[in-house]
Amino acid sequence: MSLTRLLIRDFRNIETADLALSPGFNFLVGANGSGKTSVLEAIYTLGHGRAFRSLQIGRVIRHEQEAFVLHGRLQGEERETAIGLTKDKQGDSKVRIDGTDGHKVAELAHLMPMQLITPEGFTLLNGGPKYRRAFLDWGCFHNEPGFFTAWSNLKRLLKQRNAALRQVTRYEQLRPWDKELIPLAEQISTWRAEYSAGIAADMADTCKQFLPEFSLTFSFQRGWEKETEYAEVLERNFERDRQLTYTAHGPHKADLRIRADGAPVEDTLSRGQLKLLMCALRLAQGEFLTRESGRRCLYLIDDFASELDDERRGLLASRLKATQSQVFVSAISAEHVIDMSDENSKMFTVEKGKITD
């Protein structure tokens, strides 16, 4: 599915824009601060309900306006879908699909699977475990229909359990929460383990092409001891959890450990190599989705040329073309992306929030 049309109103520095898009490559060229990243962020927000540069809604809505409005048209193999998102300064959202209100942001996320590659995206590799859990959970969300409901219930129960830890004195008082929590934790961990095992070969193959000088390994850590039932872990650690006032073990502590030649990648790879690895992982994830479900990702790439030499840019471009997916690329100069252009691509110029093609 590709985004054929995008309407933006009062988002960042963009007052209004109406863009007819290519199902292939779309290039956004402009100086720093022109608004090209804002276009990428508008697409991301339309599919996630939140921006990727700021969690503060006031910074995303254009100055002195009350709300932003985003609309898009998605073209699938058999039908077209109209989607819309409005969000005001109070953080209240309205999601519209095919003319009807009352939909959830998760429905937009399902309709628009996308991969984001930005200069800030290094957190996938050198940030905390939560960023790699998000990587795994993206895959589980798009591959397991029951994942989102289970994940939402897990978050709710963990919050309730942590609150209860401040009040209880005996483990038996926690059993009502743990009775619900344990099967959810085990199911989510199983889904994550299966997904990480399934995508491992894709990640290894793509990384070998991008970083042939390193031997990369991927290891899923579920968040508690191997070969130990989660129920046993919770009961055994009750006193420690009560002192900490939070649950110290579980799927909320899971990680995907990534190593290069046996060492953590953040300690081994240069910044340019980290970007290549990030690109490789995002590509592998998108290609795995296509193979498993027939669906294609949208790829959003901000500041394409940074950290990459000509050879590596060419490699990334060729791999993106091979996916036959829709790709949005921002760059300071058209020279950085001209080699990626073909007769089906579109080039947009962005200047002070104004977009022309």
Curated annotation (Swiss-Prot):
GO terms under cellular component: cytoplasm
GO molecular function: ATP binding; single-stranded DNA binding
SUPFAM superfamilies to which the protein is assigned, alphabetical: P-loop containing nucleoside triphosphate hydrolases
Pfam families in alphabetical order: SMC_N
Keyword list, A-Z: ATP-binding, Cytoplasm, DNA damage, DNA repair, DNA replication, DNA-binding, Nucleotide-binding, SOS response
UniProt KW DNA-binding keyword: yes
InterPro entries in UniProt: DNA-binding_RecF (IPR001238), DNA-binding_RecF_CS (IPR018078), P-loop_NTPase (IPR027417), RecF/RecN/SMC_N (IPR003395), RecF_2 (IPR042174)
Keyword Kinase: no
Record's subcellular location: Cytoplasm
Gene knockout outcome: Fails to resume DNA synthesis after arrest of DNA replication (upon UV treatment); arrested replication forks accumulate.
Recorded family membership: Belongs to the RecF family.
Physiological role: The RecF protein is involved in DNA metabolism; it is required for DNA replication and normal SOS inducibility. RecF binds preferentially to single-stranded, linear DNA. It also seems to bind ATP.
NCBIfam families registered for this protein in UniProt: recf
Protein name: DNA replication and repair protein RecF
